[in-house]
UniProtKB/Swiss-Prot annotation:
The keyword Signal does not apply. Belongs to the shikimate kinase family. It comes from the Bacteria. This is Shikimate kinase 1. The lineage of its organism: Bacteria, Pseudomonadati, Thermodesulfobacteriota, Desulfuromonadia, Desulfuromonadales.
């Protein structure tokens, strides 16, 4: 197996954490599209949004997706990667897509505990729980239609990785 693996899901669903662990077990490379964008633009996600707006950020996000796609790579995508139809089609056509499903309350707790959450701009200007519920109402269907597989991202990392390996047939 030398496929590309894409992890999709909301902010704080565990894409980066699970991605690193899965890549390690598979002996694959790991890339986080937000980290890639920050490294190539020399700006944080918040700075890109402040300077270029959400349209500019989404453009950079799509460019990053294409740039990092490679065989034997696990890619943690930004939470909004699925908003562009072209990105959804691209991921499905170029690899296996896993949706990390996590309850809103769990994501809210993770965001509250994340020291980097200040670098992640609010999408709606609301409280964390309100924002997560609003964003998930908009994106849940897109995550489901994009994914080849759905993982329970609220269990320990090792169990999520095992779920993914079982689904991949290994």
């Amino acid at each position: 197996m030398a496929t590309t693996i894409y992890l999709i899901g909301a902010r704080a669903s565990g894409k980066t954490t699970i991605g690193r662990a899965l890549a390690s077990v598979l002996n694959y490379a790991f890339v986080d599209t937000d980290e890639y964008m920050s490294a190539t633009s020399h700006m944080t996600v918040a700075e890109v949004v402040a300077k270029e707006g959400w349209v500019g950020f989404r453009r950079r996000e799509s460019e990053a997706l294409h740039a990092v796609t490679a065989p034997k790579t696990v890619i943690a995508t930004g939470g909004g990667m699925v908003l562009a139809t072209a990105n959804r089609k691209y991921m499905r056509a170029h690899g296996k897509v896993f949706y990390l499903h996590v309850p809103a309350e769990v994501m809210a707790e993770r965001l509250k505990a994340d020291p980097n959450s200040a670098q992640r701009p609010t999408l709606t200007g609301r409280s964390i729980v309100e924002e997560i519920n609003e964003v998930m109402a908009e994106r849940e269907t897109l995550y489901h239609e994009t994914a080849h597989y759905i993982l329970n991202g609220s269990v320990p990392v090792e169990r999520v990785v095992k779920q993914a390996l079982d689904m991949l047939g290994g």
